[in-house]
From Swiss-Prot:
Protein name: Dephospho-CoA kinase
MF annotations from Gene Ontology: ATP binding; dephospho-CoA kinase activity
CDD domains: DPCK
Positions in coiled-coil regions: none
UniProt entry keywords in alphabetical sequence: ATP-binding, Coenzyme A biosynthesis, Cytoplasm, Kinase, Nucleotide-binding, Transferase
One Gene Ontology term from the biological process aspect of the record: coenzyme A biosynthetic process
Function: Catalyzes the phosphorylation of the 3'-hydroxyl group of dephosphocoenzyme A to form coenzyme A.
PANTHER family cross-referenced by the UniProt entry: BIFUNCTIONAL COENZYME A SYNTHASE-RELATED (PTHR10695:SF46), DEPHOSPHO-COA KINASE-RELATED (PTHR10695)
Gene from which this protein is expressed: coaE
Domain DPCK: 5-202
Binding site for ATP: G13, S14, G15, K16, S17, T18
Top-level EC class: transferase
Length: 207
């Protein structure tokens, strides 16, 4: 694994992708578990044969990708479906993310994991954890605008995730993303310099 791994997480609508992109602009590597999940469930993705075998051909679209609407209905209708889905996807995501962290040539890697706080496996991989934070009212507003969901739908998703307090308690560092872009950039730039220093210290200590 790359010498220094920074786990990045935050609640839905917190702006994780925006912050991850800012770190990449500064020179960090990025391993995004959501992107890996999409890759695995795209047409020809490594998870598709197992998903079709487990859930039937209806979970695939005509081009062979996972039909997210169909899978979402199955998961809501049958509590065991989520466990079975995660049993197929999660080992593959863990394997690929570990391989990509190891292969990264950057001074440090941002490992973006939406449910990092809920997952002991990913937390153990990280040298630091940075949480993207904003008021819960702003999370709801952003997701409603982005995804066309109702406030109740967004609140239901938030209720299934770690609480804001739990995420902040797990954080080594916090990036506040409350719509002030200049402040956001300044926070990421300062953390980037800190992570470069910590990465160099770790390399030196391991020599």
């Amino acid at each position: 694994m790359s010498c220094f791994v920074v786990g990045l997480t935050g609640g839905i609508g917190s702006g994780k992708s925006t912050v991850a992109d800012l770190f990449v602009e500064q020179g960090a590597g990025l391993v995004d578990t959501d992107a890996i999940a999409h890759e695995l469930t795209a047409a020809g993705g490594a998870a598709m044969p197992a998903l079709i075998a487990e859930f039937g051909a209806l979970v695939a679209t005509a081009d062979g990708a996972m039909d997210r609407a169909v899978m979402r209905r199955q998961v809501f209708a049958d509590p065991s479906a989520r466990v079975r889905l995660e049993g197929i996807l999660h080992p593959l995501i863990r394997q690929l993310s570990a391989e990509r962290c190891r292969a990264a040539a950057s001074p440090y890697v941002i490992l973006a994991v939406p449910l990092l706080v809920e997952s002991g496996t990913y937390r153990e991989r990280c040298d630091r954890i940075v949480v993207v934070d904003c008021p819960e009212s702003l999370q709801i507003e952003r997701v409603m605008a982005r995804n066309g969901m109702s406030a109740d739908e967004v609140k239901a998703i938030m209720a299934a995730q770690a609480t804001r307090q739990q995420r902040l308690a797990a954080a080594n560092d916090v990036v506040v993303n409350d719509a002030d872009q200049a402040k956001l950039y300044a926070q990421v730039s300062a953390l980037h310099l800190q992570y470069l220093k910590l990465s160099a210290e770790k390399v030196k200590a391991s020599c």
